[in-house]
């Protein structure tokens, strides 16, 4: 893994900084583990925009990634590492001894030929998966389930990880990157190590077109709109909006708490720092 700054042969390449990983597979993905992906451009069945800033972008197939890691007690081996256009992390193609192949998130330090195992008790090596009850306190993990058997939901992006802080009865305490400490049942599974491609955040796309290739459309400021389109719109000449920053639907956007799931609030031991 290396960061490469391109030569300024054009204005669009002057500020490009990209990551290069020579270990990645250069061919097509495993055909049995891909699905056709349809893009809606952010529109619903009526053709109206329901998700702003979406549309265009390069066509891509969806890679079926195994977040549940429920193939238990069957050893596997990393066959190859691959690029995935649908996420910031790289993925690893695992070939199990029974012949089945699955994609998993590529952990930091994982390389071709490494053994991988998902079981109730496994060696503490990057890529191995086990319930939180068997992971030593202080370990760094990723792809953590929030409900047993549902599949990993926490720490799945490039370079992400959480730390197992303590275990009390049926619950473990995990410290997230945001500083939040959360209680999760010890039957939930997690993968050892942190997610690979940790230099993803240091890249620079260099031009607006590279963002459009990824299916992201421009963001228009509210103060540049008309009053019918945004609460900040209108006014004679350039104005500051005349009110505290809000979304197009009038909800405060800076510092306003929007979390409404009181049912799981008791699972949060310490809030993230604001």
UniProtKB/Swiss-Prot annotation:
Entry-linked Pfam families: Ribosomal_L2 (PF00181), Ribosomal_L2_C (PF03947)
InterPro entries found in the cross-reference section: NA-bd_OB-fold (IPR012340), Rib_uL2_dom2 (IPR014722), Ribosomal_uL2 (IPR002171), Ribosomal_uL2_bac/org-type (IPR005880), Ribosomal_uL2_C (IPR022669), Ribosomal_uL2_CS (IPR022671), Ribosomal_uL2_dom3 (IPR014726), Ribosomal_uL2_RNA-bd_dom (IPR022666)
Chain residue ranges for the region called Disordered: 40-59, 223-274
SUPFAM superfamilies on file: Nucleic acid-binding proteins (SSF50249), Translation proteins SH3-like domain (SSF50104)
Ribosomal protein found in the keyword field: yes
GO terms, biological process: cytoplasmic translation
GO CC field: large ribosomal subunit
KW RNA-binding (keyword) present: yes
GO MF entries: rRNA binding; structural constituent of ribosome; transferase activity
Keywords (A to Z) from UniProt: Ribonucleoprotein, Ribosomal protein, RNA-binding, rRNA-binding
Compositionally biased spans, kind Basic residues: 49-59, 256-274
Subunit structure and binding partners: Part of the 50S ribosomal subunit. Forms a bridge to the 30S subunit in the 70S ribosome.
Family (UniProt): Belongs to the universal ribosomal protein uL2 family.
UniProt xrefs under NCBIfam families: rplB_bact
Function as written in the Swiss-Prot or TrEMBL entry: One of the primary rRNA binding proteins. Required for association of the 30S and 50S subunits to form the 70S ribosome, for tRNA binding and peptide bond formation. It has been suggested to have peptidyltransferase activity; this is somewhat controversial. Makes several contacts with the 16S rRNA in the 70S ribosome.
Name of the protein this chain belongs to: Large ribosomal subunit protein uL2
Organism annotation: Acidithiobacillus ferrooxidans (strain ATCC 23270 / DSM 14882 / CIP 104768 / NCIMB 8455)
